[in-house]
A protein has these predicted regions:
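Aromatic, loop-rich ligand-recognition surfaces of beta-strand-rich domains
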Residues: 459-523, 534-578
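Conserved blade-ending motifs and adjacent loop-strand segments that build the rim/top face
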Residues: 353-373
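Disordered, acidic Ser/Thr/Pro-rich linker "stalks" and the adjacent N-terminal cap
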Residues: 419-484, 496-503, 525, 530, ...
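Solvent-exposed, low-complexity, repeat-rich "mucin-like" stalks and linkers
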Residues: 579-610, 668-671
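Sec-dependent signal peptide cleavage junction
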Residues: 14-36
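Serine/threonine-rich, repeat-prone extracellular segments and beta-strand-based repeat modules
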Residues: 609-649
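Beta-rich carbohydrate-recognition and catalytic domains
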Residues: 36-160, 167-230, 239-298, 309-314, ...
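C-terminal edge beta-strand
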Residues: 649-659
């Protein structure tokens, strides 16, 4: 199967929100635009920043009408009324955050791939800006096209992958007039490309304003792939408390770092010169190792390192993935990523693995940055969850980071798929998915993620049972297992095909798990059609069943003495909503101060004369909610009970937080 062998070298609406294009009166004439005379953004409101960059256009983003947990992605409604205009319908990726002058800058790349394009099309960068009040309200200003890849004369003008902007205060933090900004970006080097080499290199641009215009700071690449011997992308710049600057970068399981030169008199870091070996030209590179010193990066590292210091500890946050150094257990497919982190007592490692901050999302990468803004800490990343999004049309998100007393990080990551956190008659998203077989790069979890793409551009966008062409097995099954009980009377299945191995099934059926543990066919099915494609779901209705599991059983078409493979992009299960389900409020729970509450996995739902214990998805509970004694409400959504979108979902539970609370011992007799 062609989907099982390729890898991509890269770094990588419930309610409407307003998006309005404006041209601030502070914009200067194009003929006066230079990096040296760019007006300072200090002292200006985030939505009225002055600039003299003729390429910049501005959009105001207001997500305040959305429930707070649904404000991701930041630009989720930006330009969706003009879907084919990618200057307005903006897809952003590879976020890197900067706190400057009381404002939060989230710099991004710009995805311009068509919906069916299976690679990256990136040529410029933009930035979302807000302040503390704006962040709390979901309000941002988007300054688009602050820089283009062709600003470097030695670059091809594309490959505008993940970059980072840092501010240099010139040793005078109270005086913003002499501040400079440096933009570290990967671009494609013309000379390397002409020589048939991996073209990626890191360039560094500078400007008096984070909105540009920018100029090449050194007139050549800072680092090239021929120098580093790895694809030189994903730069992350960090200045330690002693004034030493470090540039981390790397991908495909290898993370490198290099120290920047320091001024012998001031002790301040250079932003444009790296340390070299004794010959004066060869970069003095450091290979990151995990705590066991047996890999070319921290455990599970794939790419997108972000290094910072908090107290005496250095934190290395990165995309974890299976192609990485070691095994990232947070993902199933080679084409997925989660956000992991490791720690060290040195910015050059070795790195001790700590865990996952944000679980795997809906894009092949996530590309994190972590920083303190005001009194809180935040993590930025991207997903494919904007309307029309794919793995190559991504959108940037931001969530709060919580810290434990011993310096561990967790994120109250708000799901970006509304289907899972809003009342709905589709109960599929509440189920755990299993399969009799899954092709290695495919992902069985894609079938209940709420996304039906026009084109499957990477393997995790669907589930397939591909083994060979043809294959000896006649068919396979997908199974939904719920923690509680659901009452369902319909299913909708999207089958996928390709020009090679994947065909519509010859036949399929829905089965349910009976109370005695036996699989049985649903009764009175309306019919099992076998159409394919996004616009052609196959819907079947049947007599309502009360069950904890459903099976989608498929038989492949007979071909060449064997059977064709089948693929499923999405499988929905419809609750028996016509029976007007009613929820019984759950009993309150108690937890100890500082301990996350254990919320009930199910609540009772009455369907006519039948009562079932239905599963619940609880909305994320911030650590601050149980940090001290008191009480609060947790909100969630019960499977299969429809309703309007709301902050509160359709069920709540009272949580009491007590100092020194200890739960009673479990005296239930094992069954």
């Amino acid at each position: 199967s062609p989907t099982s062998v390729w890898l991509i070298p890269r770094s990588p609406a419930i309610l409407a929100a307003a998006s309005t294009v404006i041209s601030p009166p502070t914009a200067m004439a194009a003929d006066s635009a230079t990096a040296d005379n760019a007006p300072s953004v200090a002292g200006h409101a985030y939505n009225e920043l002055p600039y003299n960059n003729p390429d910049v256009t501005v959009t105001q983003i207001d997500n305040s009408a959305l429930p707070s947990y649904m404000r991701n992605p930041i630009g989720q409604n930006e330009g969706i009324d003009t879907p084919n205009d990618l200057s307005q319908n903006y897809y952003s990726a590879d976020a890197s955050a900067l706190s400057y002058d009381g404002k939060l800058f989230v710099f991004t790349g710009h995805d311009e791939a068509s919906p069916d394009y299976g690679s990256f099309n990136m040529k410029d960068w933009g930035v979302y800006v807000t302040d503390e009040d704006g962040l709390n309200q979901g309000k941002w200003t988007h300054y688009k096209t602050i820089a283009k890849a062709d600003l470097f004369s030695w670059a091809t003008g594309d490959g505008a992958y993940a970059g980072q902007v840092v501010a240099d205060d010139n040793g005078t933090p109270s005086d913003t007039s002499d501040d400079w900004f440096y933009y570290y970006v990967p671009v494609k080097d013309k000379a390397s490309e002409a020589a048939g080499q991996d073209p990626f290199a890191i360039g560094v641009a500078k400007s008096k304003s984070p909105l540009g215009p920018w100029k090449d700071a050194i007139g050549k690449p800072l680092l090239t792939t021929s120098q580093t011997q790895i694809e030189t992308i994903d730069p992350a710049f960090f200045v330690d408390e002693d004034g030493t600057g470090y540039l981390h970068f790397g991908t495909f399981g290898t993370q490198l770092a290099i120290k920047m030169k320091k001024d012998a008199t001031t002790g301040r870091t250079s932003y444009t010169e790296t340390e070299t070996k004794a010959d004066g030209t060869t970069p003095n590179l450091h290979t990151m190792k995990d705590a066991d010193n047996n890999a070319n990066g921290p455990k599970g590292f794939f790419e997108a390192a972000w290094v910072f210091r908090k107290g005496d500890t250095y934190y290395n946050v990165y995309d974890g993935g299976k192609p990485g150094s070691g095994t990232a257990t947070c993902v199933e497919s080679n084409y997925q990523a989660c956000i992991q982190y490791s720690t060290s007592d040195s910015p050059l490692g070795p790195w001790k693995y700590q865990g996952v901050i944000v679980p795997s999302g809906s894009a092949t990468t996530m590309h994190p940055s972590v920083l303190q803004f005001g009194d809180k800490w935040y993590v930025t990343y991207h997903t494919g969850d904007k309307e029309g999004g794919t793995d190559f049309r991504r959108a940037v998100c931001i969530d709060e980071v919580d810290w434990t007393a011993d310096g561990q990080m967790t994120s109250t990551a708000h799901p970006t798929k509304a289907e899972k956190t809003q009342p709905s008659t589709n109960v599929a998203s509440y189920a755990k998915v299993s399969a009799t077989f899954t092709e290695t790069p495919a992902y069985k979890g894609s079938v209940n993620d709420g996304r039906v793409l026009q084109t499957i551009v990477v393997p995790p966008n669907h589930w397939t049972n591909y083994r060979s062409i043809p294959q000896p097995q006649s068919g396979d099954s997908l199974v939904y297992q719920w923690d509680g009980t659901v009452r369902a009377n319909s299913s909708k299945v999207w089958f996928d095909v390709d020009s090679n191995a994947l065909r519509a099934p010859a036949s399929w059926k829905i089965q349910y798990l009976d109370a005695d543990g036996t699989w049985k066919d649903v009764t009175s099915p309306s019919g099992y059609t076998t159409t394919t494609g996004k616009a052609n779901p196959n819907t079947v209705t049947f007599d309502a069943v009360t069950t904890t599991a459903l099976k989608l059983d498929m038989t492949g078409q007979a071909v060449d003495g064997g059977y064709a493979s089948v693929a499923v992009a999405e499988w929905e299960v419809g609750a028996a909503d016509s029976e007007s389900p009613a929820i019984t409020a759950p009993k309150g729970v108690t937890t100890a101060t500082g301990t996350a509450p254990t919320l009930p996995a199910t609540v009772d739902v009455k369907y006519g004369d039948t009562t079932v214990a239905s599963p619940v998805i609880w909305r994320p509970v911030a650590a601050s909610s149980y940090a001290k004694a008191g009480s609060f409400k947790a909100y969630g959504v019960v499977a299969g009970v429809p309703g309007e979108a709301s902050e509160q979902g359709n069920v709540s539970v009272n949580v009491t937080v007590q100092d020194g609370y200890k739960p009673a011992a479990d005296t239930t007799k094992p069954t």
